[in-house]
């Protein structure tokens, strides 16, 4: 019974559902009514539509067109497998090419790494800042670099890294720059070049205007430039150091210790108008142990005031290690021997004096040129010195160029004052310079065993002498168009024994730099001078 009741109940429910479905089909917008209850819907109307299915006459049958379906592109890969056997020679060749390419790549990479490492390890140089000296006391330290270096070498100890001469030394670096002092506002008064170390020293002088030369606010300026270069002209060189002296007029600059190229110290002796001499030193020192190596240029100056008159001559007489000596002379006739290392006095000042008049009374009948010159000098208490020369071939004598134009051969090793000799120790030429002698320099002629002496003067002439024979060995003196300030020997030119020539360089007061060629004539046994530039 209960089963029948359940079936009846289900039939009733099914019938109600069918009736509700019929009512819902009469209202198509009933689905949206729940979302828009306020919206008013129009009544549904029935529309009949007829569709023709028969084909009209004369119409063409159109073929059905297939719909275009867009398909995704599919990428496929073909894998080929070689089944033939590869020849052994071709395989070996391919392996060789691969190995060669790999080695080349590794070599190139190694070279690039080494190059980068070498550039990073390249030593660097730090120059000292320009220095200005305004006081009379110009000494920086009494412990000179040259003395310290010599003591280390004499003790037998190994020199420290800052004293060793290696490939990174200042003297051997290739440096290019153009930093020379401008010559427009300065006058070049001294120039010295050391080819062994490739160092050029140039001294410039700047004077106040003529209308202000006595003003208290104006003073003379001297500028010393030290240049690393490959030639004496100073072109394409690097300015290593520069020192300015305010109120000091430097007369000469001489490079000392030339015969010690292994030294790491540059020694320069500066002579001033007031008689002060300055030992100006430069050395290279490693800053600190680091990579890359950094070198610093250090400067030192030792000043001494031994003279009361202008210093006009500086001659190095000994180049023995730890015994380097230099002769320094003032224009009033004082001569002193000093150490090149620290300017220590090795021989007290000696005064050059003329022959006493009492000794000349016995020579009244002697009318030679030298005796007449001695008689004129006897009126004074001293002999003015303009220049000086020295040669190791005759070490006991020193040659003096006088302000009166004479050339005097003086015996150096004598106590007390230095007196001129009555016979000038064998040097009595028939002719001599008429005015101040500005330069003397020796040269040894190996071919003819001659000791040649080159001299120049403000009388516009350059002369050549045989120092041992005491006579001139030129047909006529070389006459230039102005006063000559300095002359020095250049390299030799050997073109055979009879055609051998010598060269010298001459500086004139008008700024000209002249090169003179001296050719020996075997017939006359004389030298002939020719200006070649």
UniProtKB/Swiss-Prot annotation:
**Which GO biological process annotations does it have?**
establishment of mitotic spindle localization; establishment of mitotic spindle orientation; nuclear migration along microtubule; transport along microtubule
Locations listed in the record:
Cytoplasm, Cytoskeleton
Where is it mostly found? cytoplasm
Enumerate the WD repeat regions by residue range. 380-422, 432-475
- Per the record, GO CC terms? cytoplasm; cytoplasmic dynein complex; cytoplasmic microtubule
Enumerate the SUPFAM superfamilies for this protein: WD40 repeat-like
Compositional bias, Basic and acidic residues, is annotated for 1-19
Q: Which InterPro entries match?
A: Dynein_IC (IPR050687), WD40/YVTN_repeat-like_dom_sf (IPR015943), WD40_repeat_CS (IPR019775), WD40_repeat_dom_sf (IPR036322), WD40_rpt (IPR001680)
Q: Which UniProt keywords apply?
A: Cytoplasm, Cytoskeleton, Microtubule, Repeat, WD repeat
Q: Where is this region: Disordered?
A: 1-36
Give one GO term, molecular function aspect. dynein light chain binding
- Something else known: Present with 752 molecules/cell in log phase SD medium.
Q: Subunit structure, per the record?
A: Interacts with NUM1, when DYN1 is present.
Q: What does it do?
A: Required for viability in the absence of the kinesin-related CIN8 mitotic motor. May be a dynein intermediate chain.
Q: What is this protein called?
A: WD repeat-containing protein PAC11
User: Which species is listed as the source?
Assistant: Saccharomyces cerevisiae (strain ATCC 204508 / S288c) (Baker's yeast)
* Phylogenetic lineage: Eukaryota, Fungi, Dikarya, Ascomycota, Saccharomycotina
Q: Which gene name does the record give?
A: PAC11
């Amino acid at each position: 019974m209960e089963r029948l009741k359940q079936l009846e109940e289900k039939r009733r429910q099914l019938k109600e559902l069918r009736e509700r479905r019929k009512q819902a089909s009469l209202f198509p917008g009933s689905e949206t009514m729940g979302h828009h209850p306020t919206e008013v819907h129009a009544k549904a109307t029935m529309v009949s539509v007829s569709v023709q299915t028969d084909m009209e006459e004369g119409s063409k049958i159109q073929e059905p067109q297939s719909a275009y379906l867009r398909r995704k592109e599919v990428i496929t890969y073909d894998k080929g497998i070689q089944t033939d056997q590869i020849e052994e020679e071709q395989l070996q060749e391919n392996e060789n090419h691969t190995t060669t390419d790999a080695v080349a790549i590794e070599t190139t990479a190694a070279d690039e790494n080494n190059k980068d490492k070498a550039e990073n390890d390249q030593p660097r140089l730090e120059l000292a800042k320009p220095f200005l000296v305004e006081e009379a006391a110009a000494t920086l330290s009494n412990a000179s670099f040259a003395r310290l270096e010599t003591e280390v070498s004499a003790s037998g100890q190994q020199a420290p890294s800052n004293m060793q001469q290696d490939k990174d030394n200042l003297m051997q670096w290739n440096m290019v720059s153009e930093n020379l002092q401008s010559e427009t506002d300065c006058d070049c008064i001294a120039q010295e070049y050391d080819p062994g170390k490739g160092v050029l020293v140039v001294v410039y002088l700047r004077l106040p205007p003529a209308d202000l030369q006595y003003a208290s606010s104006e003073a003379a300026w001297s500028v010393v430039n030290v240049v690393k270069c490959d030639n004496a002209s100073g072109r394409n060189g690097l300015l290593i150091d520069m020192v300015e002296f305010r109120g000091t007029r430097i007369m000469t600059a001489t490079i000392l210790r030339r015969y010690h190229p292994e030294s790491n110290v540059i020694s320069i002796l500066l002579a001033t108008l007031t008689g002060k001499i300055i030992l100006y030193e430069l050395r290279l020192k490693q800053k600190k142990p680091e990579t890359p190596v950094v070198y610093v240029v250090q400067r030192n100056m030792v000043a001494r005031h031994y003279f009361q008159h202008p210093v006009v001559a500086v001659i190095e007489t000994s180049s023995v290690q730890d015994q380097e000596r230099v002769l320094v002379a003032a224009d009033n006739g004082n001569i002193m021997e000093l150490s090149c290392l620290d300017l220590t006095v090795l021989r007290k000042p000696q005064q050059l004096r003329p022959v006493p008049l009492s000794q000349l009374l016995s020579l009244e009948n002697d009318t030679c040129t030298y005796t007449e010159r001695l008689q004129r000098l006897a009126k004074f208490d001293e002999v003015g010195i303009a220049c000086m020369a020295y040669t190791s071939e005759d070490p006991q004598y020193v040659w003096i160029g006088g302000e009166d134009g004479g050339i005097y051969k003086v015996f150096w090793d004598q106590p007390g004052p230095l007196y001129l000799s009555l016979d000038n120790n064998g040097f009595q030429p028939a002719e001599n310079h008429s005015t101040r002698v500005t330069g003397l320099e020796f040269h040894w002629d190996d071919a003819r065993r001659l000791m040649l002496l080159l001299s120049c003067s403000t009388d516009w002439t350059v002369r050549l002498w045989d120092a041992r024979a005491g006579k001139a060995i030129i047909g006529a003196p070389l006459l230039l168009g102005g006063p000559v300030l300095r002359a020095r020997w250049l390299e030799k030119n050997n073109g055979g024994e009879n055609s051998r020539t010598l060269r010298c360089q001459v500086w004139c007061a008008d700024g000209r730099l002249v090169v003179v060629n001296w050719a020996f004539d075997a017939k006359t046994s004389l030298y002939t001078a020719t200006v070649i530039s």
